[in-house]
């Protein structure tokens, strides 16, 4: 009876847990987009297309990338209280790639009108915890200079994998037309934590 009650409780709480995960990711994505769009990058302000590139399907007008890696090592107090000597090692990686692209024809329009990517992946066992999150940011710059940021509400979310550990997002970019510029970035955050026995 207790087992059945436990299973029922798990079934009742799982949807709420999934909903919480989606909400946490949404907030993370919103904060990431604010941070990236606020970066002072002069190369993204000069959006003129040189005449020699006007017949190209798409022209990359600016590109920016950065990679940040941090490492932490700490003693696992919880494991110590249980009679084990564990050292936790955590590595965090933040990887950003952003580019500004001029859309000149239908082929380029098709290529940059839809995106499909894995937004979040979680893996965990007794040896390690791994979390991966990816955020897509898109802005459309019209020929008159008007900037339209694609709302978070336009991103469609789904889950797959064992225990819904993989969160997918899809985006059909609304309002993108030939002659527009698309300002786009991918931000990848990876956190890996290893649990190792202290060799002493």
Task: Please give the residue ranges for each predicted region.
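Bacterial N-terminal signal peptides
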Residues: 2-11
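Beta-strand-rich, non-transmembrane domain signature
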Residues: 20-200
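Charged, amphipathic alpha-helical interaction segments
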Residues: 11-14, 104
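Sec/Tat signal peptide C-region and signal peptidase I cleavage site
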Residues: 15-19
């Amino acid at each position: 009876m207790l087992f059945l009650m436990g299973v029922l409780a798990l079934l009742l709480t799982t949807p709420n847990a999934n909903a919480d995960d989606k909400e946490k990711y949404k907030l993370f994505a919103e904060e990431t987009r604010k941070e990236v769009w606020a970066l002072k990058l002069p190369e993204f302000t000069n959006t003129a297309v040189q005449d020699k590139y006007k017949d190209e399907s798409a022209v990359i007008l600016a590109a920016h990338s950065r990679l940040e890696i941090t490492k932490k090592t700490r003693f696992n107090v919880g494991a110590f209280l249980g009679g084990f000597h564990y050292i936790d090692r955590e590595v965090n990686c933040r990887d950003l790639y952003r580019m500004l692209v001029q859309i000149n024809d239908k082929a380029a329009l098709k290529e940059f009108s839809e995106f499909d990517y894995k937004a979040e992946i979680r893996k965990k066992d007794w040896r390690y915890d791994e979390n991966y999150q990816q955020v897509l940011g898109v802005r459309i710059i019209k020929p008159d200079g008007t900037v339209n940021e694609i709302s978070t509400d336009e991103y469609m979310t789904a889950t797959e994998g064992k225990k819904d550990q993989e969160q997918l997002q899809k985006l059909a970019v609304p309002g993108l037309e030939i002659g527009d510029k698309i300002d786009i970035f991918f931000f990848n955050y990876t956190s890996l934590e290893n649990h190792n026995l202290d060799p002493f």
